[in-house]
Amino acid sequence: MIPKYRIRCISGGEIVPDITSLSCPAGHDSLLRTEYTSRRLQLSYHSGIFRYLCWLPVTAPLLPSGGPVTFTSDELSRELGLSRLAISFSGYSPEHHASLTTGSFKELEALATLQRLWELGKKIPVIASAGNTGRAFAGLSAQYGKPVVVVVPSSAVSRLWTTTPAQDVFLVAVDGDYTDAIAVSTALATVPGCVPEGGARNVARRDGMGTTVLDAAVTLGRIPDHYFQAVGSGTGAIAAWEAALRLIGDGRYGTKLPRLHLAQNKPFTPIVLAWQQRRRTFKPELDMPDAPNAIKEVMSPVLTNRSPPYGIGGGLFDALQATEGQMYAVSNDEGKKGMALIRDTLGIDPDPAAAVATAALVQAAAAGTVGPDDSILLNITGGGYERIREDYTLYPIEPSVTVNQHETGDTLKAELSRWVAHYG
C-alpha cells in the first residue's frame, strides 16, 4: 500500500523515515514538511477541516469537527476601498456558518494533532500555550474524551474554558510568561506516556492551520494575492505559505505565492524589528530590550512569543523571504480601532490578535501597499466569544497544579505520572 504522505527535512532535503519525528535526525536546524501522495486537492464529503482530509497527516477524520469559513463583506470592502477582499474566519458565528466553539483557529491545529497522535500510538500531548491553543486542546479533550496536558502562564488561566465539562485535562499554571510555560512543558513531555505536541515542528499543527488557505482557494477559485494575519510564533503564517505551495503544485489555483503581511502588537515586536533588517537571527538587546514589561503592555498576549520559529530552516524568515513578505507594528489604539471595524461591519467580536491583523490591513490600504483590486485574504483567527457565552454554558478549567517558572523537578513529574496512569 502506498503511504498517504512522507516527511522531508526542508533544509537538508532528506526523507525522514520516522513520521513521528519532530526534528531532522541528520541534525539540520530545520522544520520537517509533509509531502502528500496526492498532488491534487481532493475534497472529501466530511465537514470542517476534514473536507481537506487528503492534505492532512491523518487517515481518518475526527468528527464532528468545525473548520474555517471564507466569505466576503461588501461593508468592510467599501470601508477599506478594497473590491476583492475576502475574510477567513475561524471562530463562532452561526450567521457565518462558523462553528468553532473555542473561538479560535487554534482548534484547527488541535483537531489534526489529536487525531494524528491517537493514530500513532495514543500518546498524551503536552501543550504549552499563551491561552488560545490551550483552550482549543482542552475544548476538544472535553468533546472527545481524549486526555491532554496543558501548560500556561498563570495570567492565561482565565482564558481557559470549555463548553463541555473537561474531565481529562491536566492544567499546569506557571508563574511566568509563555516562554517559561514552554520550558516547563518540555520537561513534562519526558514523563512516560506523554509526548511533546511539538509547536511549529508539528506537521499536523501546520497542516491543520493551513486549511484556512485551502478553504479560501476553493471558495475563491484561486490563491489570493495577499494574506494578512497577526503572529506570535508565526506558525499559522508558515502554514499558509506551505498550503499555497501545495496549491501551486495542484495547478488549478494559480502559480504565484500570496504575499504574507504579518503583524505584531506594539511594544513587543521582535519579528518586525529583525525582518526590517532582514536578519535571520534575533538580537535580544535590539529586538526585545525590555521583553517582560513590553509583554505586559500589549492588548493581545497570544502574540508575545520570545522564541518563535523564525530563523529555523523552513521557518518564518524563509516564509517571508519566499513571499516577499512585509511586517507591521500595530499599536493598541490601532488594534482597538480594528476591533471596532470588524464588530461594526461583520457583527463579530474578534479576538484581539485578529483586531491587530485588521489594523495592519488598514495600514496597508492607506499606504497603497495593496491595490484596490488586488485579491486579499484577511485571516480573522478568532472571535465570537460573546455569542458563545449566549449559546453555551462556559466551564472554567481550574489548574491541577501551580508552579514557579523554574519548576521542572521530580515532584511535578511524579504528580503528572500518577494522572497519566489513569489512562494506561
Curated annotation (Swiss-Prot):
The EC number(s) attached to this protein equal 2.5.1.76
Which catalysed reactions does the entry list for this protein?
Answer: O-phospho-L-serine + sulfite + H(+) = L-cysteate + phosphate
Essential cofactor(s): pyridoxal 5'-phosphate
Q: Which domain of life is it from?
A: Archaea
Family, as annotated: Belongs to the threonine synthase family. Cysteate synthase subfamily.
Tell me, in a sentence or two, what this protein's role is. Specifically catalyzes the beta-elimination of phosphate from L-phosphoserine and the beta-addition of sulfite to the dehydroalanine intermediate to produce L-cysteate.
- The name on file for this protein is Cysteate synthase
Species = Methanoregula boonei (strain DSM 21154 / JCM 14090 / 6A8)
